[in-house]
């Protein structure tokens, strides 16, 4: 005869305390990834193992259209991402920058002003060895 599978009641699952796992972690060291394209800037903060702690983009911070690629949007994006992880105890970080957008320097300045000590700063911009054909010049 087959054993019956015991199921928990939905009442028990509903009254469980809800708490975010990401805010409970303490992360003293981390990696800040800055991806600066011509149209947007994305800042992702991970722990040393590579698990994402938080991320922010210029579009998610309220900038729309052309303003997403501006240095001010990149600065605001970096400040929002860093503010979250500083409250979780991060005080040392490695910064990896990728892309050639206008916001990369502004995002880096915002990270330096935040009080997080930089252990390493590395440029990870992919350089083609004459790969894909670039988009044509814009005529205005």
Curated annotation (Swiss-Prot):
GO terms for biological process: translation. One of its GO terms (cellular component) is ribonucleoprotein complex. This is Small ribosomal subunit protein uS11c. Its main location: plastid. Coiled coil: none annotated. One of its GO terms (molecular function) is structural constituent of ribosome. It comes from Pelargonium hortorum. InterPro entries: Ribosomal_uS11, Ribosomal_uS11_CS, Ribosomal_uS11_sf. It comes from the Eukaryota. The keyword Protein biosynthesis does not apply. Disulfide bonds: none annotated. Pfam families: Ribosomal_S11. Keywords: Chloroplast, Plastid, Ribonucleoprotein, Ribosomal protein, RNA-binding, rRNA-binding. It is found in: Plastid, Chloroplast. Belongs to the universal ribosomal protein uS11 family. Part of the 30S ribosomal subunit.
């Amino acid at each position: 005869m087959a054993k019956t599978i015991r199921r928990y009641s939905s009442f028990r699952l509903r009254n469980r305390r809800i708490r975010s796992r990401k805010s409970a972690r303490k992360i003293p060291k981390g990696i800040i990834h800055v991806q600066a394209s011509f149209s947007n800037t994305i800042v992702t903060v991970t722990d040393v193992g590579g698990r994402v702690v938080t991320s922010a983009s210029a579009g998610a911070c309220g900038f729309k259209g052309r303003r997403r690629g501006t240095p001010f949007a990149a600065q605001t994006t970096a400040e929002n991402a860093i503010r979250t992880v500083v409250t979780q105890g991060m005080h040392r970080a490695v910064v990896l920058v990728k892309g050639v957008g206008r916001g990369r320097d502004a995002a880096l300045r915002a990270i330096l002003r935040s009080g997080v000590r930089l252990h390493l700063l590395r440029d990870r911009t992919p350089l083609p060895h004459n790969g894909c054909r670039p988009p044509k010049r814009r005529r205005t």
